[in-house]
Amino acid sequence: MKTLLLTLVVVTIVCLDLGYTLKCNKLVPLFYKTCPAGKNLCYKIFMVATPKVPVKRGCIDVCPKSSLLVKYVCCNTDRCN
């Protein structure tokens, strides 16, 4: 009986995925990092002059506004940047 109860608890924890955190790509998309609590967006920064080449990627709490020189792209799913 104890084994069955323990099994149910483990299955519940795995299914609920307690403590889920966002994963965002680093500058090289092959590598990623797990975002700390409160950082619930992934971001990617481009220079407007070279829009195909990202300058920086990571985790952020609020998406900054783009400017004339820098464009920010933010998203909220795993490795979306």
UniProtKB/Swiss-Prot annotation:
KW Iron (keyword) present: no
Gene Ontology cellular-component annotations: extracellular region; membrane; other organism cell membrane
Pfam families for the chain: Toxin_cobra-type
Residues spanning the signal sequence: 1-21
Gene Ontology biological process terms from the UniProt entry: killing of cells of another organism
Alphabetical list of PROSITE patterns matching this protein: SNAKE_TOXIN
Predominant localisation class: secreted
Classification via InterPro entries: Cytotoxin_Cobra (IPR003572), Snake_3FTx (IPR003571), Snake_toxin-like_sf (IPR045860), Snake_toxin_con_site (IPR018354), Toxin_cobra-type (IPR054131)
Cell compartment(s), UniProt: Secreted; Target cell membrane
Disulfide bonds: 24-42, 35-59, 63-74, 75-80
Keyword Membrane tagged: yes
UniProt note on tissues of expression: Expressed by the venom gland.
Molecular function per GO: toxin activity
Keywords of the record: Cardiotoxin, Cytolysis, Disulfide bond, Membrane, Secreted, Signal, Target cell membrane, Target membrane, Toxin
Protein family (similarity comment): Belongs to the three-finger toxin family. Short-chain subfamily. Type IA cytotoxin sub-subfamily.
Subunit structure: Monomer in solution; Homodimer and oligomer in the presence of negatively charged lipids forming a pore with a size ranging between 20 and 30 Angstroms.
Biological role: Shows cytolytic activity on many different cells by forming pore in lipid membranes. In vivo, increases heart rate or kills the animal by cardiac arrest. In addition, it binds to heparin with high affinity, interacts with Kv channel-interacting protein 1 (KCNIP1) in a calcium-independent manner, and binds to integrin alpha-V/beta-3 (ITGAV/ITGB3) with moderate affinity.
UniProt protein name: Cytotoxin 1
Organism: Naja sputatrix
